[in-house]
Regions:
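N-terminal signal-anchor/first transmembrane alpha helix
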Residues: 2-69
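Periplasmic/extracellular loop-to-transmembrane helix junction in inner-membrane transport proteins
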Residues: 1-10, 38-44, 71-118, 265-282
Length: 308
């Protein structure tokens, strides 16, 4: 009975720690932010402030990984699969590299690549969607049909096929995933912009002689930002998971560079011996994904204008 209840005990402890982190982050933000923003944060749910704290921690790790990591990313230090000890707090991996250092550099590589990919996908998809909705006609039809064809192909299969053809370098990985996700951003941007271009203030701007880019930049984009910002967070989650999945399958970030998805595969044999080390990179992937979703959910709630 005690063995069965142990996981529930750990889950309760984890939830309590998350609540404390969320409350502490909210209290700190209320103190440092201007009064107007502090009022908004004061009423934020603990899930949102917990997500902010987690995202901030990941950003610090990404920016300061070489300073935080006790050892180098690729240095073989000792025997493989050493248990947790004072020298190696999380043991060593399948080649004898420090697991803690690999996790830190894995966060830097995975999050950095995912962010760059999301920015590229968002720029391509949002610009295409805004142009298609604003100009309409043959351009809208052409871009929409191209997106329909790309979205008809399962994204993971498309990525596997393209990476097998082009090679598994980081630029190719970023390009392929960006193409896959730009189609989703295009759909959202086009749908949002299509509802805005028929508004009276947009027609008035056209009658005043506003050019295409001025029309998009001054009239359409500011009113389309809330859903697009939320979509950016969601796209980052999907890109982050896609890159981790491809690395797990061997077509993402290549050794000896650290990547969270690849680290799960490399140390999977430890699960046979009841070692939780392979779970750590998977837990880091899940934690960031959940944190970003918490913040995006709160941002959508704010932009919708709904009241508690």
């Amino acid at each position: 009975m005690t063995t069965l209840l142990l996981p529930f005990g750990w889950a309760i402890v984890a939830l309590a720690c998350a609540a404390v982190v969320g409350w502490s982050c909210r209290a700190a933000l209320v103190l440092v932010l201007p009064a107007r923003n502090a009022r908004t944060v004061r009423h934020a749910p603990l899930t949102a402030t917990f997500g902010m704290a987690v995202i901030a921690a990941y950003v610090i790790v990404v920016l300061a990984a070489p300073l935080i990591a006790p050892h180098g990313e690729r240095i073989v230090l000792d025997a493989e699969y050493l248990p947790w000890n004072s020298t190696y707090p999380l043991g060593t991996d399948n080649l004898g590299r420090d697991m803690l250092s690999r996790l830190i550099f894995g966060i830097r590589n995975s999050v950095g690549i995912a962010f760059a990919t999301t920015v590229l996908a968002f720029l391509a998809g949002a610009i295409g969607g805004l142009l298609a909705a604003t100009i309409g006609g043959w351009l809208d039809q052409l871009l929409s049909r191209i997106v329909d064809v790309l979205m008809a192909i399962p994204s993971l299969i498309f990525a596997l096929l393209m990476l097998s053809i082009l090679g598994t370098s980081i630029p190719n990985l970023i390009l392929v995933i960006a193409i896959v996700d730009a189609t989703r951003v295009f759909r959202i941007a086009r749908a949002v912009a299509a509802n805005i271009v028929v508004m009276e203030y947009v027609e008035s701007a056209r009658l005043r002689g506003a050019g295409l880019w001025r029309l998009i930049g001054r009239e359409i984009l500011p009113n389309a930002m809330p859903p697009l910002v939320a979509e950016f967070g969601l796209r980052f989650c999907f890109v982050f998971l896609s890159i981790s999945a491809l690395s797990f399958l061997g077509l993402g970030v290549q050794p000896p560079s650290a990547d969270l998805g690849a680290m799960v595969r490399e140390n999977a044999s430890l699960i046979t011996f009841g070692d939780i080390t392979p779970i750590l990179p998977a837990a880091l992937i899940a934690l960031l994904t959940v944190a970003v979703n918490f913040v995006v959910d709160w941002a959508l709630h704010l932009s919708s204008g709904l009241k508690e």
